[in-house]
Amino acid sequence: MKVVAVGGGTGLSTLLKGLKNIDSFEITAVVSVTDEGGSSGKLRKELNVPPPGDVRNNIVALAKDEDLLAKLMSYRFSEGSFKGHSLGNLIIAALTKIEGSFSEAIRILERVLAIKGRVLPVSEDHARLVARFEDGEEVIGETNIVRKGGKIVEVRLDRPIDALPEVLEAIERADIIIFGPGSLYTSIITNVLVNGVKDAIKKSKAKKIYVCNLMTQPGETTGYRVSDHVKELERYLEQSVDFVLVNTRKPSEEVLERYRKEGSDFVEIDAENIQNTILAEPFLVEIVDPSDGQRKIRHDSVKLADVIERISRW
């Protein structure tokens, strides 16, 4: 069973941690390349390499010895000239320079870490995300888009870039294509904007699944319900998804209040506005982030994988 997961960031890596435990799944993760924040943004600007952070997260998620590797690859320097950089990002950047290819650097790391599946950047070319807001202003760059806030009317890339042939082949041959979880515009739709991706998805006979976010994202999806997420994704795909996975469990009031202070809120399910097949489950789990001790919410990777495995048998 060939499974392609499209996205970037924490959401996609959470999904992959569950999918890798299903023996029948051959996994390909397709990762966005428009990230401009943090360590990835600095390396992209200073070394002229594609942003390695999302790729690193997803390689670690698919690794067999995840606990040990996560500590090594995710180690972030807190002082000196490397402050803010993770070791994994530096390794990927160095391999890219040595091999002259971002994709080859990833392949080497995949072999070294013995991951289940593969991780592909959607493209090796450079592009920035551009958003046009309801007030008419256009903002360039993911970080600036989120900082601007307001209702996004349209997103595009600042220049045309081509998808890797391996990405298009994986999509066209897939039995299942999963979108998300992850930032709607900056992690998911940004992949669809790359030349060839949308057409490959249209050609594919795969079952198409959207995993909706648990919370809205300030500056990106403020006030969005489940149907708003689905409609926006389908607008850029120019086709419907077959299944929508939504969470039914609300966070504790303490956690919810902290998210609200950051401009984020629980994504409400408005099933009456959704034509797709909805699978509603208590996907939410609360975790303690070891980096800051804060209680945060994530998708339950095991439950997600179980539901997707069930869909694969329908």
Swiss-Prot record:
Cellular compartments annotated: Cytoplasm
Biological-process GO terms, alphabetical: regulation of cell shape
A molecular function GO annotation: LPPG:FO 2-phospho-L-lactate transferase activity
Keywords, comma-separated and alphabetical: Cytoplasm
Chief location of this protein within or outside the cell: cytoplasm
Highest taxon in the source lineage: Bacteria
InterPro entries named in the record: CofD, CofD-like_dom_sf, Gluconeogen_factor
CDD domains: YvcK_like
GO cellular component: cytoplasm
PANTHER family: GLUCONEOGENESIS FACTOR-RELATED (PTHR30135:SF3), UNCHARACTERIZED PROTEIN YVCK-RELATED (PTHR30135)
Family (UniProt): Belongs to the gluconeogenesis factor family.
Function, in words: Required for morphogenesis under gluconeogenic growth conditions.
Protein name: Putative gluconeogenesis factor
